[in-house]
Structure formats: C-alpha cells, structure tokens
Amino acid sequence: MINPEKAASWVEAGSAEYDGIARDIWEHPEVAFHEERSSAIYEERLASKGFSVTEFPEMKHSFMAERGSGGPVIAYMGEYDALPGMSQVCGPVKQPASEGSPGHACGHNLLGAGSLVAAEALAHFLEAEGIPGRVRYYGCPAEESLGRIPMVKAGRFNDADAIMTWHGADVNTPHRYTSSANVSLVFSFKGRASHAGMAPQAGRSALDAAQLFNISLEFMREHLSPGILLHYVISDGGQRPNIVPENAATFLYVRAPVADMIPEVMKRIMKAAKGATLMTETSFSFDIKAGKCDYRPNYVIQDLLHEVMGTVPLPEPTREETTFAKALQATVGRDDRKATLAPIGAPLDLLKSPIHRTLGDFGEGKRIGGSLDTGDVSYVVPVGQMNAATWPLGVGAHTWQSCAASGSTWAFKAMRWAGTCLAVAGYELATRSELITAAKKEFKANAIPYRSTMDL
C-alpha cells in the first residue's frame, strides 16, 4: 500500500486549488442539464494535468478524462449539479444567497472535486512509480434528474475494471447499503373543454381522469409488495374552474427495492390509467422522465475502502469549524437528526458530537428509500462508494443546512480526505491484481442483466 500519509501530504500541497474549485462551483450552482460552467472547469483542469478529455454526445456536459496506459482501468465518478431553489449562504441561519436560485444542498460541488483529487493523485503516484494503469474521471451531470443512465446505455463504463465514487454525508463510512430503484413519469390526460356552467355535458374532464387515476393508486398501495412506494402530484389541474379541463397531468414516482420489480408495478399502473380514461371518455399518454436501478455494492471494493479509510489520517476541525457545526446542528430538530443515522444503522449517540471524527462501518444489509444513478453503473461493472462527514451530525441532504455546510472550510477538508482515500484504494486495485480478480468474481456471481427502469 502506498503510504497514506504521503498521499495525504501530496493532496494537502494542492489544497488551495482543490478547495478553490469546490468553492467556485458552490458559489456558481448550476442545475441538471445546465452545468456548462461546472463541467468546463473540470474538463479544463484535467486537460491541464495531462488527461485526455472526451465529451459524450448522448448527454450534455458529460465527459470522460483518462491518463496513463496499460494495466487495469481504475475510474472515479464526479457530479456537479445543484438543486433548484436551494440557494443558501455559508452561515448558521437560513438565508438564501439569491432568492429562488439553485444551491448545492446535496454537496455535488464537493463530490466532483473530491473525485478530481482521487484521479489526479492516483495518476501521479502510478506514473511516479512506473506502474501501468489507466485512471479515468467520469463527469456525470444531472444526477438529480435523469442521471448517468444515457452514459450507461451507451456503454461508457463497460471496460472499466473498477469504479469508485463518494458522497458527502454526516458520517464517515463505506457505503455498504443499497438504494431503491425508481422510475418517474408524467401521465397526461386529454379531454374536451366546455363551459362548466352552460354546457358541462359537452365536456369531458381530463382532471376527472387524473383524479380517478390518483385514487386508483391510493387503493393499489395496500396490494403492492413491501417496499414499493408511490409519490405523485397533480402537475396540471386545468386553468379555471368554469372551464371543463381539456388537459390534466399527474407526475408520478414509483420506487421499489430492486429494479426488476418496477415493470410489474407499471403494468398495473398503466391499467389504472386506462381505466380512468374509460370512465371519463378521455385519453392518456405518458412521458418517462427518469429512472434509476438499485445500487448493488461490490463488497470486495467496499472492504478495501473501509481498510483504507482507517489508514488515511482524518482531518481535524478548527475551533471555528466546530462552532459552526454546532450552530448548524442546533437548527435541526432532535427527531429529524435521527433520520440521517437510523436508516443505515448508525448509533444515535453519535449525535452528542457536532462532527463525526471517527471511522464508522454502517449500512450492511440496509436499504435507503432514496435512489442513486450509481445503481445503474453497478449493474454493469464493480462499483464501490464511501461517505465522508462533510456535514454536521444530524444534517441531511437537500436541506439549507447541507447547502450551507457544503461551502465551509470543514467540508473542503473532508472532501480532500475522501479523495485521498479513493486514491489510495485505487492504488491498491492497480497494484494488487488479486483484488480486481476478486471484485470481478463477486460481480459475476451476483450479476443481473442490465435493464434500465426507463425501459418499460
């Protein structure tokens, strides 16, 4: 194993540049499909460090950067999209930096930069020691929406020997838990408009169809397999009450423990939509917006990450960083703080501290209700992930608190630690062929043919 302290020192020497990239992207958040500036920052940076950059046509702002030759292909995935309406200053009070603007409440400014640290550090040490191997950085836009599914379908990840990534969180742990599969789609109902007071009999209400469809989903819930969740909103309910609505729409999310459960559920949902139109003499169409498979962790890589995370020195917070973390933590309700730890089996007594300053190993055998586009990649190649405590304990993703924390100096320290861990793990994979062999053996033993949940 490469000396972890040596790797950490190399990363520390470039800390101003890495922190600057993370802060720059945090200060200039771009939502899914609009990450032109953010992706350009990474492409230009990687090109300047000797990586060859290839942009992918199937998805705007997606790319691959590669450096090195021969040996195994060790890849890292980086994200950089922000969330709409989540603007927040780096402070302990809810205060948008720009009202209604996006913000990095999922910490993707950190995720992309941390994976950049890993790719550059691994490429440096492999070349310095004359070790063969290709290091890749995949730029993955729109994680909060469509995700990297077009890249998976195009086979962009298929020839990688191992892929790793990470995410900001409130604990330091390998990501052993699985995620839920999902599909999101809009059901659009078409009726016939008429005057609701003068000639209601001449109209056919698309809103009636949408409401009957939604009611059918409510009655269906009881008879779905455990773990299947339905969430919906009426995204179009008509324009005025005195017009029989010609158009209406329901925006629906379907979640399931594993991807192969989605098609059967969707067959029943399609029947419900058809039934609603028969009752109202309307018609319907549907538009699939996104879909993600469940994440299937490769435990050979997860075990390696846990081993490495125990050797790379954890960062130390300053007094100011600890004070900031305490102030942010205090803005989260006591019960809400537990919601970040309980799903992955982390002990709740961790909440006595503002920052997780030790190494955990949580989530084995657990599944979270959320969905990750990393899941689709894990169906085609061995994938491992880790979490780093970029946020105070009890602070969850997609909150103003996580957005504030993601712009802090502590978050940048945790980001560099995560990148260092990923680099050291990549070095182990590149130099110990038995690890790659074992990871692939595990992958093949559990392999399920890939089918996107969008392919209904």
Predicted regions and their residues:
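Divalent metal-coordination and catalytic microenvironments
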Residues: I25, Y76, H108, Y137, ...
